[in-house]
Regions:
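Glycine-rich, aromatic-bearing surface loops/beta-hairpins
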Residues: 200-207
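Conserved active-site beta-strand-loop modules that form the wall/rim of enzyme catalytic pockets
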Residues: 6, 116, 162-164
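Bacterial Sec-dependent N-terminal signal peptides
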Residues: 1-25
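N-terminal capping segments
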Residues: 22-125, 129
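...with weaker cross-activation on analogous glycine-rich loops/strands in unrelated enzymes
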Residues: 126-196
Length: 207
């Protein structure tokens, strides 16, 4: 079953593995927002508890209400534990702060641990477009090609509060709009070479 949560799919813009760009060291200094991790198993149990408590009233919730519950659970309970986890192109870790994790595995592991039934390994190894179109209904996918980062950020802001999967030519991650700031959350080789939560407008990868 495909997800009903909005997603933005970015294609044909600067990808994280482009080798022909000269990278300025200053631009690689992405800001990383580190949250204090709590027991990850407890996090997943908390997600399950949220779902159980919401089960009775879930059918009565609006689409927007369901999106907010899902977004809050993922962005504020699951993801903070992963910030700082080391990146590796072949990383397949299932535990935050242990081993390494690649960008695709970061996305699919977070979604799985948030309670979604998905093929974690298969989707993580797909191109980001294939992963997104497998998970998301077409009407919720928006494509951007060769647009200025300011245009993209404005589109996210207009969309409102939410957590979005973003796919580039050779990279994937989450865009999180908390209504005050738009963040790019991803496992990347750029800068600190780990899972980062950075200001999307300042992200070298998105530019």
């Amino acid at each position: 079953m495909k997800l009903f949560f909005p997603v933005f799919l970015l294609l044909s813009i600067n990808a994280c593995h482009q080798k022909n760009k000269q990278v300025n060291a200053a631009r690689l200094a992405a800001t990383t927002f580190v949250s204090t991790p709590i027991n990850y198993d407890s996090c997943k149990k908390q997600i399950l508890l949220i779902k159980q408590k919401s089960k009775i009233s879930w059918a009565a919730l609006s689409k927007e209400g369901k999106e907010k519950i899902f977004t809050r659970a993922v962005a504020e309970t699951i993801i903070p534990n992963w910030i700082g986890t080391k990146w590796d192109y072949n990383g397949i870790s299932e535990k935050p702060q242990q081993g390494n994790i690649a960008c695709g595995y970061f996305v699919t592991t977070v979604l799985r641990d948030a309670g979604l039934n998905l093929a974690r390994i298969k989707l993580a190894q797909c191109a980001s477009e294939q992963m997104i179109t497998t998970l998301i209904q077409p009407k919720y996918i928006r494509r951007f090609s060769n647009v200025d980062i300011a245009v993209f950020i404005q589109a996210i802001q207009q969309q409102g509060y939410g957590l979005y999967i973003v796919g580039l030519d050779n990279h994937t991650g989450f865009i999180y709009n908390d209504n005050s700031q738009v963040y790019f959350i991803h496992s990347t080789f750029v800068g600190t070479r780990n899972v980062q939560k950075e200001n999307a407008a300042a992200s070298w990868v998105l530019k």
